[in-house]
């Protein structure tokens, strides 16, 4: 990964996906430190809890933001160290920071990286969600319906309608919908959106498995 540093420095979002055959955790840590050093920028570690970072001597001496405490300073470099969705709420409103995300669970933050146009240090590619203006508008509609946390029946009905639009366009992607909402919503709220997605997916499966009521399925005609 060190050979890619010049390319990495061209990007604001850097994604280190969890490797299944080779170690990406330690190289990801070194990459985050190198990005901050090359940019002469303040480095903040964002991690689920302090213990997940402090047993690394290089990270223990840095500012560590956790699910329970702190917020990163905007304008520096953030090392999202094996983060959870919950702790990633802390970077939602950072407008100028460079984010290096080192993933723990394989592909957990793939949708996040696609939405952010992140540079994937494993593949050497800039990721892209490939959203058209129309699909982006539908996703924004889903987020807007969550202004009260998807707590009302009408919120659910309208959201289900938007999800049907995505499915009709062949653009329904559960993880992408959740990642889009996570750009501005809390994880507590996201749990309610997940239930709506579950309901939608169940209804979609029933459309596939339930025969048309007008089609004769009995041999007793």
Question: Residue locations for each model-derived region?
Answer:
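Short, flexible loop motifs at catalytic/binding sites
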Residues: 1-221
